[in-house]
Amino acid sequence: MKERDSRNQIGDLPFRVKEGFSVYEFIEQLYEANVVERINRFLVKVTFNGKEFLAHLHDPGRLKDLIYPGNLVLIRETKGYKTKFSITAAYSNSRFVVLDSRLHNIIASKFLPEAYEKEIKVGNSRIDFKYDNTYLEVKGCTLVENEIAYFPDAPTERGRTHLKELRELMKKGFNAILLILVMRDDAKCFLPNEKTDPKFSIEFWNSIKEGLNVNIKTFKLVGNKIIYVRDIPLCKTNLT
């Protein structure tokens, strides 16, 4: 595995958050639990304090390396849901990987200027942020294999649509950034997951050729805080 030369990495964001900076803090207490089974995309049965509970999982990915019987997870109490708990993170490679996709845009906003718009309608979809002359779409990444972060871990038609919309915006003279939040700190570089979603991979590389900026940031969970670790580059391939 080779990293792309970091000098060629494009897509720097305007607000330079320092490495080691906390970008989110959970106010709820985090409890350790174990997975019994995944009921469906958004529901997981867990054991906690010797009892079984249903926990909400706010991440539609396959997560086969994270949500499986017996694996250790962190849960927190949540209000306004049918379940008492939400899954916050799952254990993998000696660390907890944050799984709650509701946090992605909150974290992304820490790297933006104060004046920005949210959820801007573009074509038949919505792009997460706009500031100045730039549109920015956020994607969360939890899959890491052999120090390479991969997105997506399940086919994503929505992700492909967002890339197409960003390309159309670039044709109209706007800047476009794809911000990838790797919610763990054991990746050294990033690649689109060609094996899982070859169509997304094609759209990804075509978008870069047409001027899409890509910014990839890694994070780690320390206590009840999500810490920004560092930016990582695209892995070196025959397409970079």
Curated annotation (Swiss-Prot):
InterPro entries recorded: SfsA (IPR005224), SfsA_C (IPR040452), SfsA_N (IPR041465)
Family label: Belongs to the SfsA family.
One Pfam family from the record: SfsA_N
Protein name, per record: Sugar fermentation stimulation protein homolog
GO function terms (MF aspect): DNA binding
Species of origin: Saccharolobus islandicus (strain M.14.25 / Kamchatka #1)
Transmembrane segments annotated in the record for this chain: none
